[in-house]
Amino acid sequence: PKTLKDYFDQLDIAIIPQDKTQNPNEIHVKQSSTDADFGKLSTRLPIGKYTLVAIASKKSLEVTITSPTFASFSDEHISDMASVCQEIDVKSGANTVNAVLHRCFTRLVIQSIDKEEWNVDRMVITYKGKFSKSFNPTTGFGIADEQETSYTKNVSLGRPEELTPIKINFSTFIPEETVSLTVDVKLYSADETLVRSHFDDVKVQQGHVTTYTGPLFSAGSSLNFAFDNVSLVKSDYDVSFGD
């Protein structure tokens, strides 16, 4: 069976006393998947109740755990993560705690059904809406500002021997069960915009994947939306677009 290190590169752990008048000291530990004890922690704690917050993620991002209700990543696109927030009741003697981490972000996938064009050098995708790089480990929901956030992702397109369809992932935290985003996709050659696709009311769902599938490289394509009810692995808001 696969272990934590098969999915994630780092593990941030915080053990926070619930009564800081008796014990004000928090424990913060960062582990790497190259560590022999990755996914395990042995420590000494005074008797009492604590809140454990643990976040597994990719090494490309920094993670900060401030409290059981606030943690943040260094970027709005978090790639992949899983977390747990649970109470620990430390009694006298040896205590063993098992914690199961769960993914709690939302993911939007834009999948082309047509192949890359030779004269397209890069893609610029701009996402706008209520999403955040911060989340509440207790609830799993994002902590977003009242104003909408804008995030731009630049993708350089290679020159493979055989051009293929592409897939672009955007993973982030949302503050509610369902949030609507706007997405703007621009394809560039060396000196001009070739194709632009714009999507309004892109619904993403907490803990689910929403996939938009259609032609991105075909100039002049109209948008024809078809909603598809799918399993729990995906959200209920998959969309097909194109002619």
Question: Could you tell me what each predicted segment is?
Answer:
Residues S218-D243:
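Intrinsically disordered, low-complexity repeat and linker tracts
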Residues S32-T34, K59-N98, D191-G220:
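Structured interaction patches on ligand/partner-binding surfaces of diverse proteins
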Residues L4-S67, V120-H208, Y237-D243:
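Tryptophan-paired
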